[in-house]
């Protein structure tokens, strides 16, 4: 089994490209991770996701702990076997979903007590329990438990939240079972305050995680402020370890973040947009529901090799989406995931060639 490692092959200014080696294979960076929240990327077969060029998926601890439960998944051979995906899987800690989905929740030093959004059952999620669940799932990359600081937050509110995340990170690290080829990432917080981001990074670097995520962005602060944070936050992190920007997935945001030193991304945007009839193309977004596509016999993109573009017209996709056929969601999602992986491939090629990004989609 391979050791977990991050090898930077090319660098242009702050942008890096390379390979992350894991127990479940290699992943190219910069990487975009399709979101498989409940053990599936919606409207896609696992092998179809792989065909788009994805090297890694994201799973969600909160949803999987509720249904079908981590204990059931481990009895069935782990998440990789359960969902028939043999490449790396990163699982988030569940903290963000607890904060955003659970109406009845209480944050204490111990963790977060909450009621399930499904049936109202009461649960307690702690750094130790979150780490245990991810271990049972067999996650390649485990995320430390954190509090995602809401935006806007005052300096004092952000400081209190960041310090709690640091204490939880320490407990998450102590609970993590180290195995060859597996990793745990810490999450730095601090909202939009440079002093807090620097302190958070300093505290977490001392815990020697295998990689680091920048959390608490893309929560309403806007691109300008997000980029302002990214102008300095990655520089507080080790050069030789992966940097993951959580929940960011607009093409222009990805390109801007890579140019500031980010290596990994995840977002529901391509899959959710696909199911809602929106396609990403290098010429901009296409709302396939628009009546102007009803008689359009051309593909979404002439040079895209996904099945939606190879085999079907915009008129057919328009028809499927307008009548709510499942195939419409499948084809639109396949196209969008292909677009995002092609974008990452193009980004990696530009870094290899030492070229500035002259595109934003």
Swiss-Prot record:
Binding site for Zn(2+): 304, 306, 309, 335
SUPFAM superfamilies: tRNA-guanine transglycosylase
Annotated segments matching region RNA binding: 247-253, 271-275
Keyword Glycosyltransferase attached: yes
Binding site for substrate: 92-96, 146, 189, 216
InterPro entries for the chain: ArchSynthase1/Queuine_TRR, TGT, TGT-like_sf, tRNA_ribo_trans-like
Family: Belongs to the queuine tRNA-ribosyltransferase family.
Protein name: Queuine tRNA-ribosyltransferase
Protein species of origin: Rickettsia massiliae (strain Mtu5)
């Amino acid at each position: 089994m391979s050791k977990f490692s991050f090898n930077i092959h090319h660098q242009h200014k702050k942008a890096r490209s390379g390979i992350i080696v894991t127990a479940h294979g290699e992943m190219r960076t910069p990487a975009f991770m399709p979101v498989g929240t409940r053990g599936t990327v919606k409207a896609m077969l696992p092998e179809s996701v792989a065909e788009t060029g994805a090297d890694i998926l994201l799973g969600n601890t909160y949803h999987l702990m509720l249904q079908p439960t981590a204990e059931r998944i481990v009895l069935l051979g782990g998440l990789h076997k359960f969902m028939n995906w043999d490449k790396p899987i990163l699982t988030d800690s569940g903290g963000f979903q607890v904060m955003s989905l659970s109406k009845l929740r209480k944050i204490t030093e111990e963790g977060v007590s909450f009621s399930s959004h499904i049936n109202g059952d009461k649960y307690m999620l702690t750094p130790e329990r979150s780490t245990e669940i991810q271990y049972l799932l067999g996650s390649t990359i485990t995320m430390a438990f954190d509090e995602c600081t809401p935006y806007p937050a005052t300096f004092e509110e952000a400081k209190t939240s960041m310090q709690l995340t640091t204490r939880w990170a320490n407990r998450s690290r102590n609970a993590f079972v180290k195995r060859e080829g597996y990793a745990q990432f810490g999450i730095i917080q601090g909202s939009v305050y440079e002093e807090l981001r620097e302190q958070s990074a300093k505290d977490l670097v001392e815990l020697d995680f295998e990689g680091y995520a920048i959390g608490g962005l893309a929560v309403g602060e806007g691109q300008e402020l997000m980029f302002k944070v990214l102008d300095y936050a990655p520089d507080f992190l080790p050069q030789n370890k992966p940097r993951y920007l959580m929940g960011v997935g607009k093409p222009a945001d990805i390109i801007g973040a890579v140019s500031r030193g980010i290596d990994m991304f995840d977002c529901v945007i391509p899959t959710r947009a696909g199911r809602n009839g929106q396609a990403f193309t290098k010429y901009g977004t296409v709302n396939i529901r628009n009546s102007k596509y009803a008689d359009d016999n051309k593909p979404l993109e002439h040079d895209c090799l996904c099945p939606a573009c190879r085999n079907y017209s915009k008129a057919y996709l328009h028809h499927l989406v307008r009548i709510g056929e499942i195939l419409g969601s499948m084809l639109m999602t396949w196209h969008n995931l292909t677009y995002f992986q092609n974008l990452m491939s193009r980004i990696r090629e530009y870094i290899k060639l030492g070229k500035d990004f002259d595109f934003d989609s």
